[in-house]
């Protein structure tokens, strides 16, 4: 199979993975309107082509939280990553490390902090939810700090799990889910051998280490359902600051006022994100929400963005809309499921090449030169026409 883009990895992953795993990462909440708009809105952002600019000394390098990145991309936290490839978190982290970008380990990873951190040279980032079990949160923070994690990514848009209808149809949840998953695995022998058998243990490593006992997929679903905390508030972040003195990034903001609150709190960064369309369907796409947030807090706090990014051109678009760096989620999971570490490494190379083409043809020699001036404006509007707020007629 010829791999020339992230979409090729998606097609390959769909053939390789049991349906319950493919649709778990591929799907979104409810009717998946926001999931689709994340990609569609970003694809409509028109770049301003510039020529004869002598682009021979182009550089993608950037600095974030006193770390040098080879390009403004980090791998996002993704739960169950180790179910998509044998010890998947270790493989993905190795690819990111070799590329010179951060890898973010999820709270609900298969491989625990202590397994992943020693395998890479670059300090990894760690993602944490607000959970009812504050003892687990404190334990996770202490372990992340002991393992040398440099940055905490604190996810705030999940006080309760989103309703993902596709999961019930695919076997991730719903009637007879365990039996359905078993037969799907049997029908996908490559995955069953490489991951199902040889990728064990299939614990949620960070949780197992705290509870002192193995936790399987059913435990994952049950534990999360019982532990997400709808009482989350800024006081919880103040509590976390007692145990974490490194950079803290608040993930899951879509409103400028929430971004201003993050600045007032003293966060080091925010992630403009709708959780990849997996939480509340019908909210703004990240691309549509980003410009107003950038107008409100650009320069006061680091702005990261995710949701809908599929290639290097999308990275440039997000930066032009106001992001400093992006997080890559689904795209790297498809590559990981297809070819492990080599797949993720190749995807990152493709993104780098696509970014260089986009920057060369928009006249931006450095990441700092990508801005709103890189976008095509219409009638003097401050937003690209495709992302301007909908009128009442459009909304109807």
From Swiss-Prot:
Q: Which GO terms describe its cellular component?
A: plasma membrane
Residues holding substrate? 24, 129, 164, 278
EC number of the protein: 1.1.-.-
Localisation per UniProt entry: Cell inner membrane
Q: Which Pfam families does this one have?
A: FMN_dh (PF01070)
Question: Which branch of life, at top level?
Answer: Bacteria
Keyword Flavoprotein (UniProt): yes
Which CDD domains would you find in this protein's record?
Answer: alpha_hydroxyacid_oxid_FMN (cd02809)
The FMN hydroxy acid dehydrogenase domain is annotated at 1-380
Q: Could you tell me which InterPro entries the record lists for this protein? A: Aldolase_TIM, Alpha-hydoxy_acid_DH_FMN, FMN-dep_DH, FMN_HAD, FMN_hydac_DH_AS, LldD
Q: What class of enzyme is it?
A: oxidoreductase
Q: What is its main location?
A: membrane
For this UniProt record, the keywords arranged alphabetically read as follows: Cell inner membrane, Cell membrane, Flavoprotein, FMN, Membrane, Oxidoreductase
In which residues is FMN bound? 106, 127, 155, 251, 306-330
Against SUPFAM superfamilies, the record matches this protein to:
FMN-linked oxidoreductases
- Name the catalysed reactions: (S)-lactate + A = pyruvate + AH2
Q: Which residues form the active site?
A: 275
| Cofactor(s) this protein cannot do without | FMN
Q: Does the keyword Cell inner membrane apply?
A: yes
Per the record, the similarity remark reads:
Belongs to the FMN-dependent alpha-hydroxy acid dehydrogenase family.
Q: Name the job this protein performs.
A: Catalyzes the conversion of L-lactate to pyruvate. Is coupled to the respiratory chain.
Quote the protein name from its UniProt record.
L-lactate dehydrogenase
Species annotation: Salmonella paratyphi C (strain RKS4594)
């Amino acid at each position: 199979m010829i791999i020339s883009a992230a979409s090729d990895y998606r097609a390959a992953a769909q053939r390789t993975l049991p349906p319950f795993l493919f649709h778990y990462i591929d799907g979104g909440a409810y009717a998946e309107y926001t999931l689709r708009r994340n990609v569609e809105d970003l694809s409509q952002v028109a770049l301003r082509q510039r020529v004869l600019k002598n682009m021979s000394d182009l550089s993608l390098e950037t600095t974030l939280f006193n770390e040098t990145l080879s390009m403004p991309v980090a791998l996002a936290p993704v739960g169950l990553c180790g179910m998509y490839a044998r010890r998947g978190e270790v493989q993905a982290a190795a690819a990111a490390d070799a590329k010179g970008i951060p890898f973010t380990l999820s709270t609900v990873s298969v491989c625990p902090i202590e397994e992943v951190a020693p395998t890479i040279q670059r300090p990894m980032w760690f993602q944490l939810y607000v959970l009812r079990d504050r003892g687990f949160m404190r334990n996770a923070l202490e372990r992340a700090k002991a393992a040398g994690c440099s940055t905490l990514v604190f996810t705030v848009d999940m006080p309760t799990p989103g309703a993902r209808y596709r999961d019930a149809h695919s076997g991730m949840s719903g009637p007879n889910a365990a039996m359905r998953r078993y037969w799907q695995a049997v029908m996908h022998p490559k995955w069953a051998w490489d991951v199902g058998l040889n990728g064990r243990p299939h614990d949620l490593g960070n949780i197992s280490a705290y509870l002192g006992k193995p936790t399987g997929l059913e435990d994952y679903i049950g534990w999360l359902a019982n532990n997400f905390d709808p009482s989350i508030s800024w006081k919880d972040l103040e509590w976390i600051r007692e145990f974490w003195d490194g950079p803290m990034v608040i993930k899951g903001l879509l409103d400028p006022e929430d971004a201003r609150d993050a600045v007032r709190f003293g966060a080091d960064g925010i992630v403009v994100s709708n959780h990849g369309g997996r939480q509340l369907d019908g909210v703004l796409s990240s691309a549509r929400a980003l410009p107003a947030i950038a107008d409100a807090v650009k320069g006061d706090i680091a702005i990261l963005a995710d949701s809908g990014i599929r290639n290097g051109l999308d990275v440039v678009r997000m930066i032009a809309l106001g992001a400093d760096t992006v997080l890559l989620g689904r795209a790297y999971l498809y590559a990981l499921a297809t070819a492990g570490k080599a797949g993720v490494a190749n995807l990152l190379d493709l993104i780098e090449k696509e970014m260089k083409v986009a920057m060369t043809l928009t006249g931006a020699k450095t990441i700092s030169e990508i801005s709103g001036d890189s976008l095509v404006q219409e009638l003097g509007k401050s937003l690209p026409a495709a992302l301007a707020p909908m009128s009442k007629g459009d909304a109807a």
